[in-house]
Amino acid sequence: MARVKRGVTAHAKHKKVLKAAKGFYGRRKNTIRIAKQAVEKSLQYAYRDRKNRKRNFRALWIQRINAATREHGLTYGRFIDGLNKAGIEIDRKVLADMAVHEPQAFAALVAKSKASLEYLKNTTPNAFESAVA
């Protein structure tokens, strides 16, 4: 059986790791043993933070919507409740974008939300009043 030399394969693997470690600080960028650990850890961080990015953006959208609805005298929770009761299904990303770039359209949505909340408040009897009567 012929002898197998793995110099080419090992060199290619090392180059791949060092390429991924480009831009790292200190020996993490040019020492293969340390670079391999640093690249592995960076991939773990990347995986974790791809999940966190979704949470962070949703929180940012909610903050923007809340700020915009409070300018119109409504809280975020009441606004979303009003939209749901009005049958308007717009996701938070679009709502936040509308709040920033199209204030008139957003104001119309707030008005619809308020109207649906008022309508339901006037038509639905209060639980306390019905219990007393």
From Swiss-Prot:
Domain of life according to the entry: Bacteria
Statement: the UniProt record of this protein carries the keyword RNA-binding: yes
Record-linked PROSITE patterns: RIBOSOMAL_L20 (PS00937)
CC annotations in GO: ribonucleoprotein complex; ribosome
GO biological process: ribosomal large subunit assembly; translation
Signal sequence extent: none
Pfam families associated with the record: Ribosomal_L20 (PF00453)
Keywords: Ribonucleoprotein, Ribosomal protein, RNA-binding, rRNA-binding
Bilayer-spanning residue ranges: none
Single GO MF descriptor: structural constituent of ribosome
InterPro entries, per the entry: Ribosomal_bL20 (IPR005813), RIBOSOMAL_L20_CS (IPR049946), Ribosomal_protein_bL20_C (IPR035566)
Keyword rRNA-binding attached: yes
Annotated function: Binds directly to 23S ribosomal RNA and is necessary for the in vitro assembly process of the 50S ribosomal subunit. It is not involved in the protein synthesizing functions of that subunit.
Family that this chain belongs to: Belongs to the bacterial ribosomal protein bL20 family.
Full protein name: Large ribosomal subunit protein bL20
Taxonomic lineage: Bacteria, Pseudomonadati, Pseudomonadota, Alphaproteobacteria, Hyphomicrobiales
